[in-house]
């Protein structure tokens, strides 16, 4: 390691210590100095981003997060920093995209999953405040409030219970009660902020100063004697460390300096002095992991657990050892053993960390099991069984076979096409469309996918959408006879339907289509339609633009614009 890199590491460690002490300004200065010495170290920018975010310097935090991603695009923590900064800036949709990008790199990262959930929730709230409030005052959150020490007393007050009941039924009423300190306290608890403690608010312990009575000349008010300040009770001193704890502490310091052999010496000494020092054994296992001595680390954890069982150690300590054991098994790709260890950790102490580990291992086990289940040959066998059932009109049985075929080979687009056809036979048109979409996604040039989707839409009397799907297929294979025939039938059905509708009914039906809504709400398109109605010669100029032509044709097909 170069001299500059060594100095940068020292400044980084100082910055980390300052951050842990919540001295964020000092942390930023340390990371500044470290970056000057080692400007290509992505971790330094990530750490400075976290410090800047804690100081509410959100734009600067975002800049550092982007730099970390630039230097190390395959590092998920860079995306976590970016997501957090974007979230604090109120750019929720961008935060959502950043979290998704990070999860592509590290699909089991619980922090990114939580950040994505927060961003999605905030995005929903930004678009639909009433929906966000409905989520905020859900039954689950009301239960939290009933058991929170700050808010539990409010639920003993009938008027407050009535308020919360009204807001639960109609979240849009929340603004009427925001001035109620009880309600704002509840809101603060749910949002994780102290709403009643604004920038200019007095401390909660401070009481309003009573107005002094005006003294009269005859009877001057005596000056009250100032009470003597009472001394704050002294905190009890921590008990002195045992010799074993001192050795363990020395081991921790050596570990922090990456002096692993020295750390093991101290941890062994700690256990020699106190055979019940489970934490020293657990810490030794951490050192062995760093040294890639995984089997030895497993044995150390098992000995620690045996001792913990013998002395009936604290459940939190046992949970830590089980977690470390699970981490080792995960490194060795022994997922079943890791699952058992993590399960035991949850049983001992169910908290955010142990729960996150369980989710991670369950996801990994499912991925492994799904991959082990893959078989192209077996998929073909199940697919052929499904085709035979389909020919006999046994559509539920056909679907079961196609489902099994997909499990065996989820990348075969033809199976989704077959299942789509079976769903259509059972009048499950939405499921048929979903399978057709998947088929098109996997193989965009497969014409059957467009035929399946268009047929389902036709059956739902969604003629306009069916025409668009057939048109997509014809762009790939312009002379496909089946697509051409289906398009003609759909045009005929659409014409017949529109001829029986009044103008008002036609508009109502067209308004259900989101694309038509968008076209009709476009001020530029409205102006173009006005120009075309007032000056038909202008139509030719406008329709030279392919985008305008496509929108215009959609309005014609929907019967909103009539020609001739």
Curated annotation (Swiss-Prot):
Location within or outside the cell: Cytoplasm; Nucleus
Molecular function GO terms recorded: Hsp70 protein binding; Hsp90 protein binding
Domain STI1: start-end pairs: 139-177, 513-552
Database matches in SMART domains: STI1, TPR
Residue ranges of the region described as Disordered: 197-249
TPR repeat locations: 8-41, 43-75, 76-109, 244-277, 279-311, 319-352, 379-412, 414-446, 447-480
InterPro entries linked to this entry: STI1/HOP_DP, STI1_HS-bd, TPR-like_helical_dom_sf, TPR_rpt
Skewed-composition ranges (Pro residues): 210-227
Assigned keywords, A-Z: Cytoplasm, Nucleus, Repeat, TPR repeat
GO cellular component term, pick one: nucleus
Residue spans of biased composition, Low complexity class: 197-209
Coiled coil: none
Chief location of this protein within or outside the cell: cytoplasm
GO aspect biological process, one term: protein folding
PROSITE patterns named among the record's database cross-references: TPR (PS50005), TPR_REGION (PS50293)
Record's protein name: Protein STIP1 homolog
Native source species: Dictyostelium discoideum
Lineage: Eukaryota, Amoebozoa, Evosea, Eumycetozoa, Dictyostelia
Gene, per the UniProt record: sti1
């Amino acid at each position: 390691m170069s001299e500059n890199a060594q100095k940068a590491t020292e400044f980084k460690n100082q910055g980390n210590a300052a951050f842990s002490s919540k001295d964020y300004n000092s942390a930023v200065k340390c990371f500044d100095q470290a970056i000057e010495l080692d400007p290509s170290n992505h971790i330094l920018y990530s750490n400075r981003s976290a410090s800047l975010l804690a100081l509410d310097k959100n734009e600067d935090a975002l800049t550092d997060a982007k730099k970390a991603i630039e230097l190390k695009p395959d590092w998920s923590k860079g995306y976590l920093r970016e997501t957090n900064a974007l979230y604090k800036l109120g750019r929720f949709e961008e935060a959502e995209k950043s979290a998704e990008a990070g999860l592509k790199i590290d699909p089991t990262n619980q922090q990114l999953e939580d950040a994505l959930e927060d961003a999605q929730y905030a995005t929903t709230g930004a678009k639909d405040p009433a929906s966000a409030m409905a989520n905020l005052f859900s039954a689950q959150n009301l239960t939290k409030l009933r058991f929170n020490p700050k808010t539990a007393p409010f639920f003993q007050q009938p008027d407050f219970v009535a308020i919360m009941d009204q807001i639960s039924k109609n979240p849009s009423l929340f603004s009427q009660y925001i001035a109620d300190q009880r309600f704002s306290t509840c809101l603060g608890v749910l949002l994780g902020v102290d709403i009643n403690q604004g920038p200019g608010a007095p401390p909660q312990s401070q009481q309003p100063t009573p107005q002094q009575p005006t003294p009269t000349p005859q009877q001057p008010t005596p000056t009250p004697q100032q009470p003597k300040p009472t001394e704050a009770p002294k905190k009890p001193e921590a008990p002195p460390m045992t010799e074993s704890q001192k050795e363990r502490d020395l081991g921790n310091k050596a570990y922090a300096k990456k002096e692993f052999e020295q750390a093991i010496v101290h941890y062994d000494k700690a256990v020699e002095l106190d055979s019940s020092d489970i934490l020293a054994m657990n810490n030794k296992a951490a050192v062995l992991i760093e040294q890639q001595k995984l089997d030895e680390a497993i044995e150390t954890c098992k000995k620690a657990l045996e001792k913990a069982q013998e002395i009936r150690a604290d459940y939190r300590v046992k949970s830590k050892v089980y977690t470390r054991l699970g981490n080792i098994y995960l490194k060795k790709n022994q997922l079943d053993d890791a699952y058992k260890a993590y399960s035991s950790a949850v049983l001992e102490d169910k908290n955010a960390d142990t729960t996150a580990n369980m989710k991670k291992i369950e996801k990994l086990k499912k991925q492994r099991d799904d991959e082990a289940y893959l078989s192209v040959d077996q998929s073909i066998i199940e697919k052929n069984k499904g085709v035979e059932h389909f020919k006999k009109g046994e559509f539920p049985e056909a679907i079961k076979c196609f489902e099994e075929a997909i499990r065996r080979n989820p990348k075969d687009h033809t199976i989704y096409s077959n299942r789509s056809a079976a769903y259509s036979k059972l009048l499950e048109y939405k499921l048929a469309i979903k399978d057709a979409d998947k088929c098109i996604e996997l193989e965009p040039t497969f014409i059957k996918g467009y035929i399946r989707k268009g047929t389902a839409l036709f059956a739902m009397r969604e003629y306009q959408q069916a025409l668009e799907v057939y048109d997509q297929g014809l762009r790939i294979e312009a002379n496909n006879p089946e697509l051409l025939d289906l398009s003609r039938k759909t045009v005929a059905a659409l014409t017949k339907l529109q001829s029986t509708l009044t103008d008002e009914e036609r508009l109502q039906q067209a308004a259900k289509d989101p694309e038509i809504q968008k076209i009709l709400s476009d001020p530029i398109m409205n102006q173009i339609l006005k120009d075309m109605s007032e000056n038909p010669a202008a139509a030719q100029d406008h329709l030279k633009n392919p985008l305008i032509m496509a929108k215009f044709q959609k309005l014609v097909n929907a019967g909103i614009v009539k020609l001739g």
